[in-house]
From Swiss-Prot:
Function: Catalyzes the reversible phosphorylation of UMP to UDP.
Assigned protein family: Belongs to the UMP kinase family.
Recorded GO CC terms: cytosol
Regulation: Allosterically activated by GTP. Inhibited by UTP.
InterPro entries referenced in this protein's UniProt entry, alphabetically: AceGlu_kinase-like_sf, Asp/Glu/Uridylate_kinase, Uridylate_kinase, Uridylate_kinase_bac
This protein's name: Uridylate kinase
Protein species of origin: Campylobacter hominis (strain ATCC BAA-381 / DSM 21671 / CCUG 45161 / LMG 19568 / NCTC 13146 / CH001A)
PANTHER family in the record: URIDYLATE KINASE, URIDYLATE KINASE PUMPKIN, CHLOROPLASTIC
Subunit structure: Homohexamer.
Alphabetical keyword list: Allosteric enzyme, ATP-binding, Cytoplasm, Kinase, Nucleotide-binding, Pyrimidine biosynthesis, Transferase
Compartment annotation: Cytoplasm
Amino acid sequence: MDKKKRILVKFSGEALAGDSGFGIDSTILKFIANEIKSLVDMGVEVGIVIGGGNIIRGVSAAAGGIIKRTSGDHMGMLATVINAIAMREALEFYDVDVRVQSAIKMEAICETFIIGRAKRHLEKGRVVIFAAGTGNPFFTTDTAATLRAIEIESDMIIKATKVNGVYDKDPNKFEEAVLLNSLTYDEALKDNIKVMDDTAIALAKDNHLPIVVCNMFKSGNLCKIADDDLSFCSIVK
């Protein structure tokens, strides 16, 4: 690795749930914590954003017509705080110095997000987990992750998924799906290419933030990316 990198890693809440589809699987939590620890041990400055879909999604909560979408999204933000606390505990278990910063004030649980403070934590080698999305309804955690990556001047954002990268079609449905090692932001915005939501991609494009998509369940992938090996994944730039 030529220089010290600053990377933001985004993964979904569903990833924490494992096969059960709900809640937090301690085995997966330990695995992710170890992968993040390996990055820290390389000298990489690491930020994290976790979704909340393993607990609740704002859109789903509002689908019944009783809960307003804004309230549903606030519930989703709280779910990301739950996941952030779990990840903090897992990282601390492995002696990683970590802070949680929330877009919504909740001082009894974690810090409130302040850009300068987040950067200082990163410079001191602490992992920073950004929770509660952007703090606003109608914005996804993908958009929140992209925003935080730009704010902390990250070199890239890694979207850690269950597949090896971006495909020209859904690899779970089509055996002939082809992995795209490199694509432009405009190509990523096409309807059949699912990288992130359009707002997140447009934000990354406007700020020249590379998006790397990889399989989070293959040990060592994050470290390879930090060491500039992108042969096994996809990059949007």
